[in-house]
C-alpha cells in the first residue's frame, strides 16, 4: 500500500500504449459482464476474475482453492489468483484495439493540442480522424524529383494518346454521319429527318470531346497534385486519391483515421519544428507570431518532458477496475450497472467486429466505417458528448463517461476527495440551553451513548463491570444504569465539535464540553447563536467527536467556544448578548426620570442595603439614589471626586465613594469584572457592544467568558422580571398624522393641476410627488417618535436595539409611505395607512411586489454568495503564514486621524478596518522621542495614544508589500483578528480571508440601482459589484481616466462626444469617446493629472494598473470592495481583501525573454520570474522583462502551479489535459492538494514543525528528579543471593499478578 507521507510531489503525464499494457493484468476480449444464471463473472469479460482478481476473499473461480493458506497461488484450472477481493478495486485490464484511435481530449479540447503540434486546423483534423479525408504521411521527395522528367514524359504520352483516341473517334463518327446522310438523301428523306440525324451526331461528337477533355483535365489535376504533394496534405476527394495512388503510389504514403496521425507523429521532428517556430517568433509579426508562440508552447512541452506525442494516439484502451464500475442486483432480480460498462461494451463489440472484418478481408469502405465507429465508441468512453450527440442510455439520458466521473460537484474530485463522510458523527434539532456555560452544550443521552460507545465499553471493562468488550457491548445495548454513570465519567472534559450548515466561516464549527440532557434535542448556548447564525425554528446541527489526544487538545485549545469570542473578519466580539438579554439589561439600567418611581433621592450605605429596600418594595430599580460603593470599586470614567471638607484626606483611587445612580445600574456593575470602571449610563445594544469590545481588548479570555455568562443570566432574568409585552394598544398612532397628511395632499393636488395644465412634464410630476410624499412620511415618523412614551414596550425594544428599527415602527404606527413597482421605479402614490390602521385593497396589492422580491432576491443571493466564497477560497488557499519576518522595509502609509473643521484631531472612520491590528513598519518619533517603536501591534490603546500625540498617519506592514517567497510572513500580516495576538506560523490566513469576505456576501443586495435623475444610468452595486472587482472585469459604463497630465478639450458632434487630453510634455493627444448621457467631471480647458477620472462611473482596474501602476490598483480595489461592504454596514478588515488582491497580482506577463528560459507572452509566477532573472544576471546574460498582470480570481485559481488544485476547481478536463502534456509536478504546497491525496494539510498543527515534536526534560528537570530520590530510598536487591541458574520464563513464579 502506498503511504502518502513518503512522497513529496505528484506528477501527471501522458500514458503510452506500453504503459497501459504494463498496468494491465490481462486483456478483456468479450463484452459480457456476468452470467445471469450463476451470477458469476464471465471469463475474459468485463468482470473476469482471472484478470481483475477473485470476487470472494481467498477463493478462486472454480472453488478448487479456498482459505487463506493458499494465498498467492494461481489456480491451474481457472487461472485466478487466490488473494483478497479488494484487489478488484485496483487491478486494471486493457482492450487491444484492431486500429489505433486518437484520444479525444487532445484532439477536441480547446485549443486542440494535436492541431497545434501538427499545425492542422481542428476541422481538417476531424476529417482525417473520422475517415472523411486522406492524409499524406510520407513523400519520397528525392525519388520524385529524380523521376519527374520521365514521369512528365509518360504523362504527356498519355495525354497525347487520349487526344489521338479522341481525334480518331471523332473522325470515325464524322464519316458515319456522311454515310448516313448520303443514304437518307438517296432515299429522298425530308430535310427535317436529315437535320435530326445531324444534330444527334453532333451531340455524340460533343460528348466524345467532353469526355476526352475531362480525362485530360483529370490527368492534369492528378499530375499537378502529385508534383506539389507534401507531407500532411489532405485529400478529401476519394477518387482523385485513388487515381494518385494507382499512378504514383510508390512515391508517397497516405492513409485515413488515427493511423495516419500515428504515422505522422512517429516521423515528426520536434527539435526542427521548435527551431522553425523560434525563427518565426523572432522575425514574424501579428497573427503569425501569436500562433507560433502558442504552437511553441505545445512543442516545447513535449521536448522538455519525457512525454511522447505518440501518447495522443492509442493502440489499446485501459479498463478500470471492476469495483469502480460495479454491477449490483436489485430486488426484482434485475441489475443496475455503471454507465461505464455500457460504454466499454460498445468499444469491445465494435473492436471485435473490426477484427473479424479485417480477418475476412472486407472491402475498405466497410472497414473504414467500422474504424470510424470504433473511434466514436472510444471518444464516448473518454468524454461522452464532447463531439456530436452523446450516447444515451434508457430514457434518453446521456451516459456518464470517464471525464464525467471527474467533473463537477458530483465528480471524483469534489464529491469523494475533497468532501468525505466521517464516522463518529450525529445530527439533531437544536434548542436553547440558557442554563449552560459559554463552553458547554447539551447532548441527548442516547446520542452521547452512541457517540462515545467505544470509550464507554473500554471503561466498563476497566472497572470490571464487564469481562470483555463483547459483554460490555451487550450492557450498552441493553441500557443498564451503570452504563450512564460510566458515560458521565467518560464525557467529562472530552470536547465535541458542533457544526451548523452552511459553514460560512470558521466559527461555523466550534468545540464544546458536552453535558448530558434528557430528550432528543441538542442544547446550545444562546450567545453562540450569532456565530453559527442559528435560531431555534427547527435548525439542525451536526456533532463530531475528536478521538485522538491531539485532536482533543486542538479542539479544547483552538476551537472551544470561549476561546472564539472574536470574529476573524474584523477582530471584534461576535459573542454578544442579543434580543431578550439586551432588553433585560436595558430595563435594568434605564433611568426612572420620566416615571413615577418609588424611593427617589434616598441614600444607602451599600448596595446590599439598597437591595434590601428593593426586596421590601420600598425602592424601584430605576430610582435615582445615592449609594456608597466599597473599597476597590473604580468610579465611572470622567468622575470627579466631590469637594472635600476641611481636615478630610484627599480622595485616592480605591477609596470608597458615593455616587448618584440607580440600583439597577449598581446590579449591572456587579456582573462586570471588579476592576472595570463603573458604568453609569443606559445600556442598550450599542453600549453593550462597546463594553464587550473593551473587555475583549483588555481582559483574559476566562474573565471575558465568565462576564458574558453573567450578562446572559442577568439579561434573561430581568427581561422576564420587566414584564415587557406587546399589545395592540401599545401601537400609538400620532394624533397629528391626519393634519400632516391633509397638508401634503393639498400639495399633491397642486402638482397634479400643474401637470394637467401642461406646465410640467410627466417625469417632473413623478419626481415632485415622490419628494412631497417622502417628506410627508418623514414628518409622520417624527411625530410618531415624539408621541411614543419612553416606557412603551415596543419603543423600548427598538430603543434598546433588542429588535426592530424605526423604519419598521414607522410602518406599524405611522404610514408605510412609497413603494416600488416591478420595474424598480417608485410609485408616486404613497400608502397612507399604517399596519395598525389597516391597508386598503389597492394599498395591500401594490405593497406585495416588494415583499415577494425580497424573498426571491435572498434565494438568489445565497447561491451567488456561496459561489463567490468558493472562488475566493480557491484563489487564496495556499496563503499560509510561513515565517516570522520576511525582513522587508516596505510598508503602507495609512491615515489614522484627520482634523475636523474645529481643528481638533479625530480618529478616521475606517481606522477599525485599515490600521487596527497591523504592525508598525517604523518607529513613530515626535520631537526626537520614540512614542511607538517599530514592529509593535497597533491596538485600540496605542492608536488612541498616537492620536493624542497629534500623529495623523503611520507606516504599517502589509501583505501587499510582503517579500516572502511562499505564503506570507507573520509581521506583514500582523495581529490574528480571531485571537487578538500576533498570528501564529502555519495559520491559513488565505482561507480566513476568503471566509471573511464571502460570509457577509448574503447580506449584500443583488439589484443594480438606477441613480436618481439619469434614467438608464445603471450602477452595479452589492454582490455583483464585488464579483466584478474580484474577477477584474471591465465594469459596465466604465469611466475613462487620463493617461497623462495635460489640458482638457471637449468635442461634441450631433452623434458623438469625446474628451481630448493634450499632454503637457507635447506628446500625442489622447481622445476618449464617451456616451452623450455620461456626466463629465472635467470642464473645457481644465488641467488634469495622470489617472484623474474624466466622467462619473467605475474605473477599469486594468487601466489603473497600466497607467498608475501596481500600488494604485491595489488601493483602488481595496477601496472599492470596502465601499460595497460599508454601504451594508458590514465590517471587514482590509488585510483580508489585500490577501485576495495579492493573489490576483501574483503573475507577470513576459514581454521580452532575453536570455531567460521564458517565452514572450507567457504568464509566470512573480517568484519564478525573479529567480530566473537572478540566475541569468549572475551568468552575465540579459534578463527578461515583464509587466504585472491583474487576473480575476477564477483565472488566477486555474493558473495555479498546482494541477491538483486547479483540476478540482473548474474545467477539470482542460486542466488535466494541459497538465499531462506538460508532465506537471505538483509539489503539494497548498491545502487542497494535500486534502486530495489524504495527507495532513501544511497549515496549523499539520506543519512538520508542530508535528515532529518530542518532549525532552531539561537538565535542571533531570537533576531535580534525581535529587528528589535519595540513595537509601531505592530498593536494590542484594547481590549474590540468587542461585545463578537460568529459569525458563514459563516456570517463573510471578506471584499473584499471573492469575
UniProtKB/Swiss-Prot annotation:
Reactions that this protein is recorded to catalyse: RNA(n) + a ribonucleoside 5'-triphosphate = RNA(n+1) + diphosphate
Q: How is the cofactor bound?
A: Binds 1 Mg(2+) ion per subunit.
Q: Which SUPFAM superfamilies match?
A: beta and beta-prime subunits of DNA dependent RNA-polymerase (SSF64484)
Q: Which cofactor does it need?
A: Mg(2+); Zn(2+)
Q: Where is this region: Disordered?
A: 385-405
Q: Which residues bind Zn(2+) 1?
A: 60, 62, 75, 78
Q: What is its EC number?
A: 2.7.7.6
**Which is an annotated GO molecular function term of this record?**
magnesium ion binding
- List, in alphabetical order, the GO biological process terms annotated in this UniProt record: DNA-templated transcription
* Residues engaged in binding Mg(2+): 535, 537, 539
Keywords in UniProt for this one? DNA-directed RNA polymerase, Magnesium, Metal-binding, Nucleotidyltransferase, Transcription, Transferase, Zinc
Q: Which residues bind Zn(2+) 2?
A: 886, 962, 969, 972
Query: Which enzyme type, at the first EC level?
Result: transferase
What does UniProt give as GO cellular component? DNA-directed RNA polymerase complex
For the keyword Transferase, the answer is: yes
Among InterPro entries, the record links this protein to:
DNA-dir_RpoC_beta_prime (IPR045867), DNA-dir_RpoC_beta_prime_bact (IPR012754), RNA_pol_asu (IPR000722), RNA_pol_N (IPR006592), RNA_pol_Rpb1_1 (IPR007080), RNA_pol_Rpb1_3 (IPR007066), RNA_pol_Rpb1_3_sf (IPR042102), RNA_pol_Rpb1_4 (IPR007083)
State its role: DNA-dependent RNA polymerase catalyzes the transcription of DNA into RNA using the four ribonucleoside triphosphates as substrates.
Subunit description: The RNAP catalytic core consists of 2 alpha, 1 beta, 1 beta' and 1 omega subunit. When a sigma factor is associated with the core the holoenzyme is formed, which can initiate transcription.
HAMAP family per the UniProt record, alphabetical = RNApol_bact_RpoC (MF_01322)
Q: What is this protein called?
A: DNA-directed RNA polymerase subunit beta'
Query: What species was this sequence derived from?
Result: Streptomyces avermitilis (strain ATCC 31267 / DSM 46492 / JCM 5070 / NBRC 14893 / NCIMB 12804 / NRRL 8165 / MA-4680)
